[in-house]
Design a protein with these regions (language model features):
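A generic alpha-helix structural signal
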Residues: 44-47, 90, 134
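Conserved active-site and cofactor/substrate-binding residues in soluble primary-metabolism enzymes
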Residues: 38, 42, 81-84, 128
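A generic structural motif
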Residues: 22-26, 82, 124
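Glycine- and Gly-Pro-enriched alpha-helical subdomains that act as flexible
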Residues: 5, 9-57, 66
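Short basic, glycine-rich beta-strand/loop surfaces that mediate nucleic-acid
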Residues: 17, 69-81, 94-140
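Short amphipathic alpha-helices within nucleic acid-binding modules
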Residues: 84-91
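Short amphipathic beta-strand starts and helix->beta connectors
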Residues: 3, 53-64, 97-107
Length: 140
């Protein structure tokens, strides 16, 4: 069980950014997009991946994570066009010391059995730190 402190001093805004990949190879030399429900499910997986890992390992929450859980659960969805773009944002987040979780779909319903990177979540961390990595990405 993960416990939060009774009160958390919030210094600055804390948020999570979900980065969704828009385009995928269709296997015929073209591109395709995901069904809207599939995109939403992938974003949900990303949003809770960090917390699931904390629970499995019995890790304590950071102050930013506690503030996010006790606050408004602020989430922003942005998009990138390709797997390469997704990997670039992921690496920038890791290099900046941010919480970042990549989601790879197993391929059972959309990708003919091929595991495929679909999205990632960055944070919860301080907004100004996340903005350094995602501030130029388009809202989705």
């Amino acid at each position: 069980v993960i416990e939060c402190s009774q009160e958390v001093e919030i210094v600055g805004e804390v948020k999570q950014v979900i980065v969704i990949r828009k385009y995928y190879p269709d296997g015929k030399g073209g591109i395709k997009t995901l069904r809207r429900g599939k995109e939403i499910a992938q974003g949900c997986h990303a949003s809770i991946a960090w917390l699931s890992e904390k629970v499995r390992h019995g890790s304590k929450l950071t102050k930013d994570e506690e503030a996010w859980i006790q606050g408004a659960f602020t989430k922003i969805c942005v998009c990138v066009n390709s797997e390469e773009d997704l990997l670039e944002v992921y690496q920038k987040a890791l290099d900046a010391g941010l919480t970042a979780k990549m989601i790879t779909d197993a391929g059972r319903t959309e990708f003919d059995g091929i595991p495929t990177r679909t999205c990632l979540a960055i944070g919860p961390n301080k907004s100004e730190e996340i903005d350094k990595v995602t501030g130029e990405l388009k809202l989705y």
